From Swiss-Prot:
Cofactor(s) annotated in UniProt: Fe(2+)
Organism per entry: Thermoanaerobacter pseudethanolicus (strain ATCC 33223 / 39E) (Clostridium thermohydrosulfuricum)
Gene: def
Membership in a protein family: Belongs to the polypeptide deformylase family.
Listed name of the protein: Peptide deformylase
Alphabetized Gene3D superfamilies for the sequence: Peptide deformylase
GO molecular function: metal ion binding; peptide deformylase activity
Active site (catalytic residues): 131
Role played: Removes the formyl group from the N-terminal Met of newly synthesized proteins. Requires at least a dipeptide for an efficient rate of reaction. N-terminal L-methionine is a prerequisite for activity but the enzyme has broad specificity at other positions.
Enzyme Commission number(s) of this protein: 3.5.1.88
Record key words, sorted: Hydrolase, Iron, Metal-binding, Protein biosynthesis
Catalytic activity of the protein: N-terminal N-formyl-L-methionyl-[peptide] + H2O = N-terminal L-methionyl-[peptide] + formate
Binding locations of Fe cation: 88, 130, 134
Amino acid sequence: MAIRYVRKIGDEVLRKKAKPVTEINSHILTILEDMAQTMYLNDGVGLAANQIGVLRRLVVIDVGEGLLELINPEIVYEEGEQVGAEGCLSIPGVVGEVKRPKKVKVKYLDREGKEREIEGEDLLARALCHEIDHLNGVLFIDKAIRFLDEEEKEQVKEV
Ligand code: ZN
């Protein structure tokens, strides 16, 4: 396992669409493990493969309920609406309010290649949407309805 460098805004890899994983081999599992390690080191709640310069549809998330590894994640259902503050490891120091679904259902493959589904609400729904956006080259700043100033940022926990 290795810590990977997190690509920052301006790096074109963040604007590219990641390709589906066609074979879950040891290379893919190593990338997932590196992503998890990199996410934890940076105190993030999620990371998409684009952020470490890999254009494959891989996401890791941990909102405090354990590590989720998602291969080829896809939103299959969404419901409601929430507006909340969001940040991104690729855009340090910026926090913006983003409108997201209140609840989402995501279909994905686990590391054994088994098809699974996860339902997320609130922070988990937000993290799932944020990371899947990354796989499509979309950043939260594209969707932010308002950016927070320094004083407001101190009162908000970044996600
Ligand atoms: Zn991000």
